[in-house]
């Protein structure tokens, strides 16, 4: 009985740590509640967040700058990892977008643009062993 309880608590801890590392917020606003973000994730981003999905065979590095000039804490998205969500809710309201930069692990720029909230940025395989970016707005 104790073994089942320990195994269950380990699974819950692992699941919560995966959830926490896939949600990125403004460095000045560490609130856990983001208005506009769905309670249960569907297959698209909420209106106040940007979703980044890596479906390529390459690891990518994501960085950016929020509207107020504060940099996003850079993070890596590994090949076929679960989606990452960048919250645009800070200073008490939802911001329109941010400058987003996505580079390959070797430093080659894949995407550099101002990205609006509610956008899904999908990194997909391209040609032999490269990657390209596809955008969808919901």
What are these regions (language model features)?
Residues 5-14:
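Sec-dependent N-terminal signal peptides
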Residues 19-138:
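Intrinsically disordered, low-complexity segments enriched in small/polar residues
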């Amino acid at each position: 009985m104790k073994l089942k309880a320990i195994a269950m608590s380990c699974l819950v801890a692992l699941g919560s740590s995966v959830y926490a590392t896939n949600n990125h917020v403004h460095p000045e606003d560490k609130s856990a509640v983001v208005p506009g973000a769905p309670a249960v994730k569907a297959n698209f981003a909420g209106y106040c967040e940007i979703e980044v999905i890596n479906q390529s065979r390459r690891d990518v590095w994501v960085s950016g700058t929020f509207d107020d000039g504060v940099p996003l804490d850079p993070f890596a998205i590994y090949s076929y990892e679960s989606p990452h969500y960048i919250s645009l809710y800070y200073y008490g309201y939802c911001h329109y977008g941010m400058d987003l930069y996505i580079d390959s692990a070797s430093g080659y720029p894949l995407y550099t643009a101002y990205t609006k909230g509610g956008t899904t940025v999908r990194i997909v395989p391209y040609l032999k062993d490269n990657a390209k970016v596809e955008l969808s707005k919901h």
